[in-house]
UniProtKB/Swiss-Prot annotation:
InterPro entries: YbaB-like_sf, YbaB/EbfC. GO terms for cellular component: bacterial nucleoid; cytosol. Homodimer. Signal peptide: none annotated. Pfam families: YbaB_DNA_bd. This is Nucleoid-associated protein Tlet_0999. One of its GO terms (molecular function) is DNA binding. Gene3D superfamilies: Nucleoid-associated protein YbaB-like domain.
Length: 114
């Protein structure tokens, strides 16, 4: 920040070249925080085993539910594999959804510090 000085050492105010950029940065931070808070209300689902297992997760990385066909309980190893696969897919979907929503705000601006 520079001061404009006239003759005799008088100051005519301050020039703040970065204030506009800082305001944009702050607005984006506020929007991102608002988005982060909204993630607890956004859900995604995934399936494995041809729909035998369904996992629903919130976009704040919280698993909401796991549904499965009772017949899967007969083969514990397969049941475990399908649960893990559905959870991993749900988490990938959460990450994808978060990135999509964030890119709407940031707009791939490449602004540092965000």
């Amino acid at each position: 920040m520079k001061k404009i000085k006239g003759f005799g050492g008088k100051s005519y105010g301050k020039i703040d070249k970065s204030s506009g950029f800082e305001q944009i940065q702050q607005k984006m931070r506020d929007e991102i925080e608002k988005l982060e808070n909204s993630f607890e209300n956004i859900e995604v689902s995934s399936t494995s085993g041809g729909g035998a297992v369904k996992v629903t997760a919130k976009c704040n990385y919280e698993i909401v539910s796991i549904e499965y066909e009772d017949s899967l309980l007969e083969d514990r190893e397969m049941f475990n594999d399908l649960i893990v696969a559905a959870i991993n897919e749900a988490l990938r979907e959460v990450t994808k959804k978060r990135e999509e929503e964030l890119s709407k705000i940031v707009g791939l601006s490449g602004l540092p510090g965000l």
